[in-house]
Amino acid sequence: RALKAEKYFDTNNADVYTMDINPYSYQQEILDKLEAERTVRGYTHNLVVAATGTGKTVISALDYKRFRKQNPDRPCRLLFVAHREEILKQSLYTFRAVLKDANFGELFVGNYKPESIDNLFLSIQTFNSQSFTEKTRPDFYDYIIVDEFHHAAAPTYQKLLSYYQPRILLGLTATPERMDGKNILPYFNNRIAAEIRLPEAIDRKLLCPFQYFGVTDTVDLDALKWSAGGYQKSELEHIYTFSGAVADRRADHVVTALLKYVTDIDEVKGLGFCVTVDHAEFMCRYFNDHNIPSMCLTGQSSGEERAAAKRRLVSGEVRFIFVVDIYNEGVDIPEVNTVLFLRPTESLTIFLQQLGRGLRLSEDKECLTVLDFIGQANRKYNFEDKFAALLSNATRSVSREIKDGFVSVPKGCYIQLEKKAAKYILDNIRASYGNTAGLVTRVASFTEDSGLELTLKKFLGSLPS
């Protein structure tokens, strides 16, 4: 069994499995709310919404530990489902630490094959490819956790969610809102059991504050093709990378803005989020050519390459890592103090995950500096939800916040939009309210977004003036 533990992790650090892991006060509040949902309301399907960096996995492990204690005569079989191997590995490690059991659970993802499926950390891709329901009864698992539950409205999750009948279903997410309008709340009696969103997490000093600069972009995306909820990556890549003087001018603008807004370039430990591999490599070359040491990582980069990049960034050997499709979920470099959004991000979930990469607390880190390059956008692009997610007061419209100078930011935070960038956003918001589909969507999600009861007066009060 000790060998089984060593398959995944270095088990030389025995202290991890002997120390008690106790919840922080805010985590205990969430655990208490979960218990109340089950004992008072009788709801055993529960959704926890917690900002990136507040320890969703630790909360789930502590909740499962309590469930085992309450059910000593049951096998308490656990199924933990996620869509990335990195998340599953980290989650298994967390559960072993919380349960103080170096042999608890097994992975079933990629090249990992379990000896037992009793306590399993399973990728949704493996579940679908292995005809997993044929191996288990609907009630085989007592406790099922689905991480990043905002993915669960996708067809790939439907078989799992409709087949199994666990005693407890726990959904974890930082953002329950989905771009495609599909609602995940019906899985949970249309309730969020407990939540701690990003503004509250910053106010409680669980995450570091941010200074957010909306920089006017040099490129116009208004004429680019919009389909299936977003821009075409190939078109964005062309304009950012292969458009000759246009791409060079934009890259130069990024460097100029960076030097303008950061206090000391030599202290920067930054991530730059790019649209494609070619774009990331282009930005990396441009920064290196302008004496800002940088690296590039992609979803194809090996674990060794990622570890080396992290070491070089933390040590100050490089200032930036330009990335594509990684550092969204489940990867931590707490020392990151600067984030560049070098592409429009249609998904609110991905935006918050990428922002969250820089919001981790770290010694000698006072705040996160964010540079978001904002150009003229397609009228269907949603600026409003992005900024609303950064504000503590959900009752004020983003348009009003822009005009008033973002008075509802969390403690110690700051949002500043350059003049043209602010105009692009305001024009975009006005256009989105000018079509019927946009209004219907906002009415449908008003209560969930604002926390207020839907009345005509309250809804009209939320509209931009």
Show the residue positions of the predicted features.
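ATP-dependent helicase/translocase motor core
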Residues: 1-51, 58-76, 93-97
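Long, largely alpha-helical accessory region at the distal end of helicase-like NTP-driven motors
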Residues: 17-19, 250-253, 260, 385-465
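Conserved helix-turn-beta segment of the N-terminal RecA-like "Helicase ATP-binding" lobe
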Residues: 86-109
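Conserved helicase ATPase core of P-loop NTP-dependent helicases/translocases
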Residues: 89, 107-113, 132, 281-284, ...
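Post-DEXD/H (motif II) to motif III coupling segment of the RecA-like Helicase ATP-binding lobe
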Residues: 151-213
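Conserved interdomain linker/interface between the two RecA-like ATPase lobes of SF2 helicase motors
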Residues: 192-271
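Conserved helicase/translocase motor-coupling segment
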Residues: 237-311
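Conserved segment of the helicase C-terminal RecA-like domain
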Residues: 348-353, 357-387
